[in-house]
Amino acid sequence: MTEETHPDDDSYIVRVKAVVMTRDDSSGGWFPQEGGGISRVGVCKVMHPEGNGRSGFLIHGERQKDKLVVLECYVRKDLVYTKANPTFHHWKVDNRKFGLTFQSPADARAFDRGVRKAIEDLIEGSTTSSSTLHNEAELGDDDVFTTATDSSSNSSQKREPTTRTISSPTSCEHRKIYTLDPYPMDHYHPDQRLPRSYPQVTFPEDDEEIVRINPREKIWMTGYEDYRHAPVRGKYLDTTEDADSYVRFAKGEVPKHEYTYPYVDSSDFGFGEDPKGSVIKTQPPRAKSRRRKENGERSRCVYCRDMFNHEENRRGHCQDAPDAVRTCIRRVSCMWCADSMLYHCMSDPEGDYTDPCSCDTSDEKFCLRWMALIALSFLAPCMCCYLPLRACHRCGVMCRCCGGKHKAAA
C-alpha cells in the first residue's frame, strides 16, 4: 500500500479503530496486513474513480503509528459482507477479500451499518450529501465516530494557520475560511506557547449528585486491551484539548454539619448518679441514601459497549450479555449436534455457517439444511424441543423476565 489517498475527515460516514486483515488462500487463514497494528478504518465519500462526475464510497484504512495506507477498497453494489463473529467482519469484491478485527462489538456494528448505508445509496443512485453524510439518527449516537480525533493524531499534527483551504465533498471548488484568532500568530515567537484559557468547572454543594471528570480520558482505546476491561469512555466530555490540559476546580465554602444534638437539662442528673452513666440515645438523622445517584447515572456496558441507565436496566436489554436460560435451552435440546453438523458439512471456506433455525429463504442451502436437521432429529429427538422452548424464551424476554442485563464497566 502507498500513502496516496487522504480523504477529508468530514467525508466519512463512519470511522472506527480496527486491525486490517488479509486472506491467505494457501493456508486458509486470516493474517494482519502489512505487519499488523491498529488502523483508523472508515467509509468515506469520494469522487468516482472512473471520472464520470458521480460520487462513490471508499473503505480507507490508515495505520496509526506510521500513517501508512493499508486498506483501499471501493464499495460496489455486488459487495458480499460477512459477519463472522461480533468482532471480526470480512467482505469480498472482485475476488479480493478484506477483513477487520474490531476492538468492540459496538465498533463492528457501526461499521456494518456504514457499509450497508453506502451500498443502499449506490443502489438508489443518491449522491446528495444530505442522504449519505452524518446520518447520525440512523447510525446511532454511541456507534458512529465521525468527528472524534484521538490525542495521538493531534500531537503529530502541527498548528494550522488562521487561513485554511477546504474542499466540498460534492464540488471541486475551493473556498477559504477565515477564522478570527484573538492571538495573532506573528505576535509570538515560534518556540513560545500560546496562552490558553482553561475551562473552570464549579461543582454544586448538593451531596446527591457526584460528578467524576477525568481529563485524560480518551474516546478511543489504544493498543490491544480487552474491550470488556477497558476504561469507561467519556461520551459527553470535550476531547479536543491536548492531553496535558487540566480542569480547575473552584473550591466553595466547606459545608458545615447540620446535625442537631438534643439538649439535656442538668436537672435530669441526680446527685447520686454518675453524669457519665447517662447516654444520649437519640442519634442524628442519617443522610439521604445515595441510591438515587446509582440509579440515575449512565454507564457503559462491558458486553455490548452501549450506554445504559441503571434505573432502566432490566432483563432482556442486552443481547450480548450471558443468558443462563438460553444456554440451558441449547444444552437440553442438544443444539450442539446441529452446530457440529453444519460446521463440518455446510460451512464456507472461512468456517462460517447459517444459524440452524434460520428462516431466510435467500440462503442457497435453505432446503438442504432443514432436511438435514429433520434427519438429525430422528437420532436426537430432544432437538424437537428447541423451537417451542425458544418461543417461550422470546416471550419471556419481551416480558422482561428472561434475557441478559447490562453490566457497568469497572
Curated annotation (Swiss-Prot):
It is a peripheral membrane protein. GO terms for biological process: negative regulation of epithelial to mesenchymal transition; negative regulation of ERK1 and ERK2 cascade; negative regulation of intracellular signal transduction; negative regulation of lens fiber cell differentiation; negative regulation of MAPK cascade; negative regulation of transforming growth factor beta receptor signaling pathway; positive regulation of DNA damage response, signal transduction by p53 class mediator. Residues 146-156 have a biased composition (Polar residues). The keyword Membrane applies. Its main location: membrane. One of its GO terms (cellular component) is cytoplasmic vesicle. One of its GO terms (molecular function) is protein kinase binding. Keywords: Cell membrane, Cytoplasm, Cytoplasmic vesicle, Membrane, Phosphoprotein, Ubl conjugation. Disruption phenotype: SPRED2 knockout results in a dwarf phenotype characterized by reduced growth and body weight, shorter tibia length, and narrower growth plates as compared with wild-type mice. Mutant animals regularly develop kyphosis and scoliosis, and show craniofacial defects, splenomegaly, and cardiac hypertrophy with arrhythmias. Residues 300-408 form the SPR domain. It is found in: Cell membrane; Cytoplasmic vesicle, Secretory vesicle membrane; Cytoplasm. CDD domains: EVH1_SPRED-like (cd10574). The modification Phosphotyrosine is found at residues 224, 227. Residues 5-122 form the WH1 domain. Phosphorylated on serine and threonine residues. Phosphorylated on tyrosine. Phosphorylation of Tyr-224 and Tyr-227 are required for ubiquitination. Ubiquitinated; leading to degradation by the proteasome. Predominantly expressed in lung, liver and testis. In testis, it is specially found in mature spermatids projecting into the lumen of the seminiferous. Strongly expressed in glandular epithelia. Also expressed in embryonic tissues such as heart, lung, liver and brain. Residues 127-171, 274-294 are annotated as: Disordered. Homodimer and heterodimer. Able to interact with SPRED1 to form heterodimers. Interacts with RAS. May interact with ZDHHC13 (via ANK repeats) and ZDHHC17 (via ANK repeats). Interacts with TESK1. Interacts with NF1. PANTHER family: SPROUTY-RELATED, EVH1 DOMAIN-CONTAINING PROTEIN 2, SPROUTY-RELATED, EVH1 DOMAIN-CONTAINING PROTEIN FAMILY MEMBER. Negatively regulates Ras signaling pathways and downstream activation of MAP kinases. Recruits and translocates NF1 to the cell membrane, thereby enabling NF1-dependent hydrolysis of active GTP-bound Ras to inactive GDP-bound Ras. Inhibits fibroblast growth factor (FGF)-induced retinal lens fiber differentiation, probably by inhibiting FGF-mediated phosphorylation of ERK1/2. Inhibits TGFB-induced epithelial-to-mesenchymal transition in lens epithelial cells. This is Sprouty-related, EVH1 domain-containing protein 2. It comes from Mus musculus. The lineage of its organism: Eukaryota, Metazoa, Chordata, Craniata, Vertebrata.
